[in-house]
Amino acid sequence: MSATEPHTDQPRTLADLCKVCNIPMHSLQLPCAFCKKTVCTAEIYAFQYKDLFVVWRHGFPHAACALCLELHGQINYRRHRDRACLWETVEQECGKPLEEIFIRCWLCHKPLCNVEKQRHVDYNRRFHCVRGYWKGRCLHCWKP
């Protein structure tokens, strides 16, 4: 097992980590998995809201700060974008309606809600396949 692989008994979410450690989320002090700086409380809550998983390194939990998440998103998008498709193609490739397809924002990593997916449809914007996962833009990161 590598240093980044979690043991099966290690919590995967911040909420689970808080339960296991019996501490409130606002008391968590975790390093960023990328820059190693302590992730601030607002970023801890944003990490949980974005439904991201805890990264385990050498037995210690890590989260990610907003700046590193955005930078990591941009790097992945630029280096690993496989293709860009309109919603019809995404539905066809996945074999299910857009509402049932899990899509994250490629910039901030938040899961897109149905309103955000519909915005791509309404504005004829493409979804992007990055490392085998479909990505789009959330309302916060949307740029016309």
UniProtKB/Swiss-Prot annotation:
Subcellular location: Host cytoplasm; Host nucleus
UniProt main location, coarse: host cell
Pfam family, one: E6
One Gene Ontology molecular-function label: zinc ion binding
Function: Plays a major role in the induction and maintenance of cellular transformation. E6 associates with host UBE3A/E6-AP ubiquitin-protein ligase and modulates its activity. Sequesters tumor suppressor TP53 in the host cytoplasm and modulates its activity by interacting with host EP300 that results in the reduction of TP53 acetylation and activation. In turn, apoptosis induced by DNA damage is inhibited. E6 also protects host keratinocytes from apoptosis by mediating the degradation of host BAK1. May also inhibit host immune response.
Subunit structure: Forms homodimers. Interacts with ubiquitin-protein ligase UBE3A/E6-AP; this interaction stimulates UBE3A ubiquitin activity. Interacts with host TP53 and EP300; this interaction inhibits TP53 activity.
Misc: Belongs to the low risk human alphapapillomavirus family. The cancer-causing human papillomavirus E6 protein has a unique carboxy terminal PDZ domain containing substrate but low risk E6s do not possess this domain.
Family per similarity comment: Belongs to the papillomaviridae E6 protein family.
Protein name as catalogued: Protein E6
Organism: Human papillomavirus type 54
